[in-house]
């Protein structure tokens, strides 16, 4: 990243596991922090520990939510709204951009496509009125080697999101083409300027480098004794809230298959017992 390409005053937006990085590449002060729905409960717990440890400062936390999800996800979001009212719901920002929101709804419904977290931040920034967006870290999964600026294969995050055990944890619902189209849409319909501030990034193949050349001397501070993995709350906390009552291992396909096989004899026994009772009647 070339810091001279940044303006003198700017707001920082970060998302997901950014706190894994071993340096404060963009400083400790963050304007908006974005977390995905699937691990928001754990991310919120983790981030509050980061604040407690003076690892970061922030203004707002935003849930990267969509209104066109299934009923189970919508119920989860509604539940979170009551449990964690201090978190802003991202889809409230999306609704301010009616044309873009319709674009998202259509492609999720009919083509099973969704923007990535980095692009989601750009959408929220546009809805907030920002006109100049300076981007780094959005590489459309084109980077060779580790696609992250940090080691992402950590024990707890893999427990919660098994796909992180892979070198590149790309979901089929995401694609470079769809992300690019979303960014172009923001440019065309809302007049935002999108600049790249990492000259070696694949992003520069599609958007120009920032025209700025500020004499900024910024040396990222190296972290010491910092949080390097997502934190999982005590089991007692999960028991307090019904929606998360089962540990996430129950959501693992292999575990559920083995569990169902182990339960099969007992289920057959119950079914035969019920059949005998019906025959007696």
Task: Please provide the spans of the model-predicted regions.
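Metal-ion/cofactor- or nucleotide/acyl-coenzyme-handling active-site neighborhoods
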Residues: 1-281
């Amino acid at each position: 990243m070339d810091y001279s390409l940044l303006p003198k005053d700017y707001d920082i937006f970060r998302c997901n596991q950014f706190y894994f990085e071993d340096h404060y590449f963009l400083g400790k002060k963050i304007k908006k922090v974005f977390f995905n729905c699937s691990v928001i409960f754990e991310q919120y717990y983790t981030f509050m520990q980061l604040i407690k440890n003076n690892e970061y400062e922030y203004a707002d936390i935003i849930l990267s939510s969509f209104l066109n999800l299934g009923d189970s996800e919508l119920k989860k979001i509604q539940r979170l709204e009551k449990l964690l009212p201090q978190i802003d719901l991202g889809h409230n920002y999306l609704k301010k951009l009616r044309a873009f929101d319709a674009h998202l709804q259509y492609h999720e419904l009919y083509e099973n496509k969704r923007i990535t977290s980095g692009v989601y931040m750009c959408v929220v920034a546009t809805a907030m009125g920002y006109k100049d967006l300076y981007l780094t870290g959005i590489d459309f999964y084109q980077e060779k080697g580790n696609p992250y600026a940090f080691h992402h294969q950590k024990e707890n995050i893999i427990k919660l999101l098994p796909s992180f055990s892979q070198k590149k944890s790309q979901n089929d619902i995401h694609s470079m083409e769809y992300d690019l189209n979303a960014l172009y849409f923001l440019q065309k319909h809302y007049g935002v300027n999108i600049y790249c501030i990492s000259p070696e990034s694949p992003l520069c193949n599609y958007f120009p480098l920032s025209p700025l050349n500020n004499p900024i001397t910024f040396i990222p501070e190296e972290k010491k004794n910092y949080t390097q993995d997502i934190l999982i709350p005590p089991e007692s906390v999960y028991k307090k809230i019904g929606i998360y009552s089962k540990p996430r291992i129950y959501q693992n396909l292999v575990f559920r298959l083995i569990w169902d096989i182990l339960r099969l004899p007992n289920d057959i026994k119950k079914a035969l017992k019920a059949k005998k009772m019906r025959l007696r009647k």
